[in-house]
């Protein structure tokens, strides 16, 4: 089916199958559509709300066109959020990735520049001295040797440049805001995925099943695309093609409720100071608790099932300052 027919289908309010969506997004990524066509397509998908098939197709096209990452045969994870929750918190998932790796897990973190916050994963890592533009081979070497690497979305998904001007002009959430966490070019074994809106938990979970994720958590924490300590966290656990929905509270992690305000970050430079202090064992207790809760759930994917024990282990590890050594090693690649 030609692009125009697929677009016409969207304009008339009909949804696309996975294969149709893959074909249309292939055309977008390969630069075959005009900006006007891309804008119309994104708005049509937004007004009706993209369904699981359409998101799955978009993910498939993104991965088919991505720069190849030499995938290891050992289990590894990603911890990543959609961004766009508008809360301007410190970089919790970036810190959690470094801490988990320092504790022995393997994490290939996929990330980008800031969407809506002042400081996205690549912004803060660059400020910390990490080269986010390493080659896939160098990133793989870091994953092998120190347990963590960063995959900069713009480097692996260069076809997204065709969409960038349209997204900038539209200034609204589109399907591209929700693709990021699902299109890690390393194709991780495990995923901890944060979403900016509660209604995305189910959509994401169903998409993870369609993408045949081995074991994933999708979380939305009372307005955050992370595990929350200021309220409840809605969770979908995807394992062997099945989805289980449940809620986690701070008590489930053995932690007290704390204000969202205590996690406010700022520009990359400010967030860098917070993360450096945290990884050195000199950070704010609220920051340590938030990172401990998120890292605890990430470690559960690796078979460490006791969340409260995981939190205690993470807090002890943070206090030791060893996580900072992992960050220092990451800056050498």
Curated annotation (Swiss-Prot):
It catalyses: N-(5-phospho-beta-D-ribosyl)anthranilate + diphosphate = 5-phospho-alpha-D-ribose 1-diphosphate + anthranilate. Its cofactor is Mg(2+). Keywords: Amino-acid biosynthesis, Aromatic amino acid biosynthesis, Glycosyltransferase, Magnesium, Metal-binding, Transferase, Tryptophan biosynthesis. One of its GO terms (molecular function) is anthranilate phosphoribosyltransferase activity. It holds the Pfam family Glycos_trans_3N. Mg(2+) 2 binds at residues 225-226. SUPFAM superfamilies: Nucleoside phosphorylase/phosphoribosyltransferase catalytic domain, Nucleoside phosphorylase/phosphoribosyltransferase N-terminal domain. The keyword Glycosyltransferase applies. It is an enzyme of class 2 (transferase). Its EC number is 2.4.2.18. One of its GO terms (biological process) is L-tryptophan biosynthetic process. Anthranilate 1 binds at residues 81, 112. 5-phospho-alpha-D-ribose 1-diphosphate binds at residues 81, 84-85, 89, 91-94, 109-117, 121. Binds 2 magnesium ions per monomer. PANTHER family: ANTHRANILATE PHOSPHORIBOSYLTRANSFERASE (PTHR43285:SF2). Belongs to the anthranilate phosphoribosyltransferase family. NCBIfam families: trpD. Homodimer. This is Anthranilate phosphoribosyltransferase. It comes from Haemophilus influenzae (strain 86-028NP). The gene is trpD.
